[in-house]
Amino acid sequence: MPQTPPFSAMFDSSGYNRNLYQSAEDSCGGLYYHDNNLLSGSLEALIQHLVPNVDYYPDRTYIFTFLLSSRLFMHPYELMAKVCHLCVEHQRLSDPNSDKNQIRKIAPKILQLLTEWTETFPYDFRDERMMRNLKDLAHRIASGEETYRKNVQQMIQCLIRKLAALSQYEEVLAKISSTSTDRLTVLKTKPQSIQRDIITVCSDPYTLAQQLTHIELERLNYIGPEEFVQAFVQKDPLDNDKSCYSERKKTRNLEAYVEWFNRLSYLVATEICMPVKKKHRARMIEYFIDVARECFNIGNFNSLMAIISGMNMSPVSRLKKTWAKVKTAKFDVLEHQMDPSSNFYNYRTALRGAAQRSLTAHSSREKIVIPFFSLLIKDIYFLNEGCANRLPNGHVNFEKFWELAKQVSEFMTWKQVECPFERDRKILQHLLTVPVFSEDALYLASYESEGPENHIEKDRWKSLRSSLLGRV
């Protein structure tokens, strides 16, 4: 079975390593190079550059970059149809009289390309049209050669397993989503059902940080690289197809991950605002500071930022009497690390340190890098917005897409890390399903704990008591 090198091998210190596969200079027109780097090309020429022949196999960085960015210009099934056509016609796979030796030379290369596509962008093949074309081309390669037949079978079985795992994951997400209810509703109907706070479920902040890392890595793992591009898909001005392109905007796993960040922030705020006694609220704040600190040590920056966001929500930050009982030195250090000034300079420095540690890791724990996800999306958004997809001559601006692919492939390396910590089902269940307060309910709980300080807060408190509790 053709093996693809790991994502970390795609780059050298200067950026893209174009020498992983020795390839001849492209003979078809429509591609523009500078210093041996591909900068732009017509869409047609770029598609041809993707297709191997007897003497040529595209560099892996090119394959990843083009498969990632091409969806801004055409549907993956349209690209697959073109690739199949070029393979069949140019390599004469459909001709029974074609040279068997030539087919033996080209077949492993086409199979390698299909393997790279199915391994890196498996979600493309949820589309029946993609799967049909894949099986058709694979069948042509495999006919008459037992070795290729086994390899094709292995590739398709591996793809089907990945798609089945994705469907299962989506079912679990849907189940979690349908069972999560507003905490205030539960409190009013079954007050005894959620007496347990997070410290009762998990008294050790280090263990909680590890369980948060489990959730983060599982959710990261299911995000397809294409979702970063599909999140910003817009109609290509040179595309004459007037049909809706929303089909390309499939980002459900990315959205589920952003929702998890929001849930964790609200969970932190809920756990802090819930206790009636001031000392219990202060203890809860100190507990989450320790959890956040351990997240930082692990390299789990997403949970760290979600916890800080929860503690900085107005209903929590206004609890001045509670905060007065908290030793905040450790929290101040964490806030400094995630300070948004200078475009998150401190965080980016820490992230680079974690990424470097991951590259030279001696243990699976040292490999963990979980970026602050909203900032990663923002960076990719600004990269996408800051440069045109096409140049004035209609060429695809490939220089932009090298940079996009570089950012996404780094993420791909991080998301493939196995979580080394033991799973605790009880803690995970609590983190994922315990009801949390809405923003209004958080404010109400906050005012009930420490009364309103001015007329605006008093009016809001009365309004919330009336609307949420039915009291005046």
Swiss-Prot record:
What keywords were assigned to this record? Endosome, Guanine-nucleotide releasing factor
Q: Which residues form the Ras-GEF domain?
A: 204-452
Q: Which Pfam families match?
A: RasGEF, RasGEF_N
Gene3D superfamilies (UniProt xref): Ras guanine-nucleotide exchange factors catalytic domain (1.10.840.10), Son of sevenless (SoS) protein Chain: S domain 1 (1.20.870.10)
Answer yes or no on keyword Ligase.
no
N-terminal Ras-GEF domain sequence ranges: 34-164
Q: Which InterPro entries does this entry report, sorted A to Z?
A: Ras-like_GEF, Ras-like_Gua-exchang_fac_N, Ras_G-nucl-exch_fac_CS, Ras_GEF_dom_sf, RASGEF_cat_dom, RASGEF_cat_dom_sf
The record's subcellular locations are:
Early endosome; Late endosome; Midbody
* Biological processes per GO annotation: Ras protein signal transduction
Any single GO CC term annotated in Swiss-Prot or TrEMBL for this entry: early endosome
Does the record's keyword annotation contain Hydrolase? no
Q: What is its main location?
A: other
Q: Could you tell me the superkingdom of the organism this chain comes from?
A: Eukaryota
**GO MF terms, alphabetically ordered:** guanyl-nucleotide exchange factor activity
Q: How does it assemble?
A: Interacts with CCDC124 during cytokinesis. Interacts with Ras family proteins.
What is the recorded function of this protein according to its Swiss-Prot or TrEMBL entry?
A: Guanine nucleotide exchange factor (GEF) with specificity for RAP2A, it doesn't seems to activate other Ras family proteins (in vitro).
Per its record, how is this protein called by name? Ras-GEF domain-containing family member 1B
Which organism's genome codes for this protein? Bos taurus (Bovine)
The record lists the lineage as: Eukaryota, Metazoa, Chordata, Craniata, Vertebrata
Q: Which gene encodes it?
A: RASGEF1B
